[in-house]
């Protein structure tokens, strides 16, 4: 279910402060906040989003505005379905 428009987008306050401080910096901003929505202020900033194991660098562009950071850092690795083990070699 989508978030109510009267509530507005959710972004962690510490992430907004880090983005404002690192406006001209090339260094990625590390965050564990996958739930934060991408705002227009974040365009052009590299944010390293935690996927449960390590941080995945995400370069934010204008097409990502309105999506959540967690959508761009995949958490599951698909190794393929089980099959005939003899034919794999």
UniProtKB/Swiss-Prot annotation:
Gene Ontology cellular-component annotations = cytoplasm; small ribosomal subunit
Q: Does the keyword Translocase apply?
A: no
Q: Which InterPro entries match?
A: Ribosomal_uS19, Ribosomal_uS19_bac-type, Ribosomal_uS19_CS, Ribosomal_uS19_SF
Give the top-rank taxon of the lineage listed in the UniProt record for this protein: Bacteria
- Single GO term (MF): rRNA binding
Transcription: present as a keyword of the record? no
**PROSITE patterns to which the protein is assigned, alphabetical:** RIBOSOMAL_S19
GO BP annotations of the record are: ribosomal small subunit assembly; translation
Q: One short Pfam family name for this protein?
A: Ribosomal_S19
Gene3D superfamilies (UniProt xref): 30s Ribosomal Protein S19, Chain A (3.30.860.10)
Alphabetic keyword roster = Ribonucleoprotein, Ribosomal protein, RNA-binding, rRNA-binding
Q: Which HAMAP family match?
A: Ribosomal_uS19
Database matches in NCBIfam families: rpsS_bact
- Described purpose of this protein according to its UniProt entry: Protein S19 forms a complex with S13 that binds strongly to the 16S ribosomal RNA.
Q: Which family does the similarity line name?
A: Belongs to the universal ribosomal protein uS19 family.
Instruction: Output this protein's name.
Output: Small ribosomal subunit protein uS19
Q: Which gene encodes it?
A: rpsS
């Amino acid at each position: 279910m989508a978030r109510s428009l009267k509530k507005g987008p959710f972004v962690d306050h510490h992430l907004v402060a880090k983005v404002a401080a690192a406006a001209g910096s090339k260094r990625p901003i590390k965050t564990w906040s996958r739930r934060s929505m991408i705002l227009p202020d974040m365009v052009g900033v590299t944010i390293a989003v935690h996927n449960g194991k390590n941080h995945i660098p995400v370069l934010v562009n204008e097409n990502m505005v309105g999506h959540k950071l967690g959508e761009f850092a995949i958490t599951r690795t698909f190794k393929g379905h089980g099959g005939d083990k003899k034919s794999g070699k």
